Amino acid sequence: MQYITLAEGITAPALGYGTYLIDPAITERCAREALEVGYRHIDTAALYRNEAGVGAALRGAEADGVARDDVFLVTKTLGAGQAETTKSFEDSLRALNTDYVDLLLIHWPMGDEVGAWRALEKAHATGKARAIGVSNFFGREFREVVRAAEIPPAVNQVELHPYFQQRALRPLLDDAGCQVEAWSPLAAGEAGLLHDPVLTRIATAHNATPAQVTVRFLLDEGVVVIPKSTHRERMAENLASLDVVLTDSDREKIRALDTGHSVIGWPAHPERDYDPAQYPGAAHSA
């Protein structure tokens, strides 16, 4: 397994298992299979309504010798401001049937982001969240949280894949010491990413799949990756991306696929295609 180090020296597997849009009725089975295949990083959220299944999978895995402390568990709050965020997190802990999570994220800017961040800082101070961060925060919202934070965000989870590599946002995160993480790293099957001729040619050259090449590329770019699948063989396939070795030429070709624009994000987000030119100095100031 490949690891990254977050703020305060917390380590996490760089390749995790995502649960977005996994039916709550099958989440326990899927998460349990992911753990059996070898994943030790699971990502869920209040919005997904499948935290209980993730929690059940973790409890079941303990019988196989996978302790709770062996799994890097991530969830995301739903709500605006401190009170709503606190309640959302407490509900998540109950659903997950755990005393703590390894990473707690604000899922989305929903208003009073600073108040929401205060709730996360309190969760961190009480030991209920080992690390805290944000998701889908771009120029204005991210800078606002960083300016107000006593504890800066350790992670920002955003749409990121070969067609949208977040080159404008990443310097802002780097300056803040914030790790970038990719949701839907395979572009959720949109825009034909896994049939892209560049990726398929590279995959053929390495006896790999386009999905494996994509995951390996993002890991090489310093991105935490959380692909999702409900099929055990695909889970194993994604995990085997760790064994793929790309060349410098491969990576340059994949970098050239970047369009600079979202292909699957929420159109309602006011900063969906973050452009630092809209925020003078944003690219290199926190």
Which residue stretches match the model-derived regions?
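N-terminal binding-site loop/beta-alpha segment at the start of enzyme catalytic domains
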Residues: 1-71, 186, 281-286
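Beta/alpha (TIM)-barrel catalytic core signal, keyed to glycine-rich beta->alpha loops juxtaposed to Asp/Glu
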Residues: 3, 108-286
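CE4/NodB-like, metal-dependent polysaccharide N-deacetylase domain
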Residues: 7, 85-106, 122-126, 148
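Acidic-and-aromatic substrate-binding clefts and catalytic sites of carbohydrate-active enzymes
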Residues: 22-25, 45-53, 78-83, 109-113, ...
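Short, acidic/polar
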Residues: 22-35, 81-97, 115, 140-143, ...
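A structural motif
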Residues: 39, 98-101, 129, 153
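Short, well-ordered amphipathic alpha-helices
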Residues: 52-62, 89-93, 120-121, 142
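A short, structured active-site edge motif that brings together acidic residues
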Residues: 67-81, 102-109, 136, 160
